[in-house]
Amino acid sequence: IYCPVIIGRSGGYLDSFPEYRNSSVNVAIGTDTFPPDFFQNIRVASMYAKMVSGTAEGASYADIYNAVTLGGAQYLGRPDLGRLCKGAKADLIAVDLDSFHMGAVDDPIRTIFLCGSGADVKLSVINGRTVMKDQQIEGVDLEEIKAKGQIYYNKMKLGYMERDYQHLPAEKLFRPSFPMR
């Protein structure tokens, strides 16, 4: 599983997405970060693949989209995921293409991945059940989740410093964007 945003944050990248793909190596693109904006992940994966290989061939948004959907399903051994067809789980999203920042719409997939973000997702259906509509998840308090997330993040940072094999201080592991006094 390739997580381009996370790997890229520390200067890493996948050697050659097109080469793996052309060699029939399954590449599944995922994310293990918050916020998990998959459109950003797809955009970054596509850019890295094109930069590393020096060509746009084999790293189109369709290629990356297939790595996200079909590649992930194959990695999990789940032929009922990653596609819309008879016998598959009805997992889908609806994206608002009318917002100004989307610009002119030519190819919907390309437009979404070039200009969109997770904030443009208006509907999410998982296994045929609507779980999010109009950006609202029934019974979920996002402010409460955000506050708990900050608490867990702070604990994670402390634990990370304890486990760091170099025993670097927090200011080295979690450098601020600008010096703070």
What are these regions (language model features)?
Residues 3-8, 32-34:
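Short, acidic/turn-prone active-site loops that include or flank metal/cofactor-
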Residues 69-181:
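Active-site microenvironment of metallo-dependent hydrolases
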Residues 9-14, 38-40, 104:
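Short, charged, surface-exposed secondary-structure boundary motifs
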Residues 1, 28, 125:
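Conserved beta-strand segments that form the floor/walls of ligand-binding pockets within enzyme
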Residues 1-2, 94:
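Conserved beta-strand positions in the central sheet of alpha/beta enzyme cores
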Residues 16-99, 114-118:
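His/Asp/Glu-enriched, well-ordered alpha-helical/loop segment
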Residues 8-11, 75-77:
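Active-site glycine- and acidic-residue-rich loops that bind
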